[in-house]
């Protein structure tokens, strides 16, 4: 089945390439323009459960931008209790408390990643971000709205709140593969993390390109395993450490 999984990855990435380029370019342009407003402007990334890896993917990454503020509340991550994280993912009330821990400013952008786009916390994150004057980019699977209901009190999905929506082209239920044998039917091998990571890096690549077109030097981290990287990276950390909580 390992080759079948790779085939599913390829098919989904090709679908992203065929259908989502305009939305990805719009998201990158929106974020790039927001980064030009102030010397220390950043953009923010948020996700619950496994989607929190989206925030980690862009944070403090070799070849990645330094102006990324990941929102990483332990309540919504798995390492302090998987069941607890699922409970809080459906809880709207926790978002304001979480956002109050971070420096979120008007006219900045936040990327919110939620495969289903149906749970209370990521939807409320979009609502609260817009209330605070941020622009919201959502990465989600649009299949869910067609097949299930929202768990947010508004009855809305994440895609209904966001300013720009990028469909990760993932399946309902996330699992890419299925096997039927006798009475057994099992779905397995999730895709969403792979697809979200592809989209996030496409966005970031386009942001870097936009900055270069404007004759700006993108604040990109070097790998800590190459010579000369430490001095370069420390300068970027010094520039953004007051804005990026987890630096």
From Swiss-Prot:
- Protein name, per record: UPF0309 protein Teth39_1980
User: By its UniProt entry, which PANTHER family does this protein fall under?
Assistant: PHOSPHOHEPTOSE ISOMERASE, SEDOHEPTULOSE 7-PHOSPHATE ISOMERASE / DNAA INITIATOR-ASSOCIATING FACTOR FOR REPLICATION INITIATION
Which family, according to the similarity comment?
Belongs to the UPF0309 family.
Q: What does the record give under GO molecular function? A: carbohydrate derivative binding
Gene Ontology process terms (BP): carbohydrate derivative metabolic process
SIS domain location is 31-213
Pfam families attached to this UniProt entry: SIS_2
* Disulfide pattern: none
- Record-linked InterPro entries: RpiR-like_SIS, SIS_dom, SIS_dom_sf, SIS_GmhA/DiaA_subfam, UPF0309
């Amino acid at each position: 089945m390992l080759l079948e999984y790779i085939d599913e990855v390829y098919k989904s990435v090709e679908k992203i390439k065929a259908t989502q380029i305009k939305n990805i370019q719009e998201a990158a342009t929106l974020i790039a323009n927001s980064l030009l407003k102030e010397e220390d402007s950043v953009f923010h990334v948020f996700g619950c459960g496994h989607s929190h890896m989206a925030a980690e993917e862009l944070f403090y990454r070799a070849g990645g931008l330094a102006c990324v503020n990941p929102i990483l509340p332990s309540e919504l991550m798995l390492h302090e209790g998987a069941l607890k994280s699922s409970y809080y993912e459906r809880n709207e009330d926790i978002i304001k408390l979480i956002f109050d821990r971070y420096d979120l400013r008007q006219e900045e952008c936040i990327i919110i990643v939620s495969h289903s786009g149906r749970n209370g916390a990521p939807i409320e994150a979009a609502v609260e971000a817009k209330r605070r004057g941020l622009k919201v980019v959502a990465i989600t699977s649009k299949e869910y709205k067609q097949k299930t209901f929202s768990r947010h009190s508004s009855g809305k999905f994440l895609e209904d709140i966001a300013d720009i929506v990028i469909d990760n082209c993932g399946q309902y239920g996330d699992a890419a593969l299925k096997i039927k044998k006798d009475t057994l039917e099992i779905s397995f091998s999730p895709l969403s993390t792979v697809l979200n990571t592809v989209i996030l890096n496409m966005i970031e690549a386009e942001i870097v390109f936009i900055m270069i077109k404007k004759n700006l030097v993108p604040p990109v981290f070097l790998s800590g395993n190459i010579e000369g990287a430490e001095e370069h990276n420390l300068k970027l950390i010094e520039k953004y450490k007051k804005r990026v909580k987890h630096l």
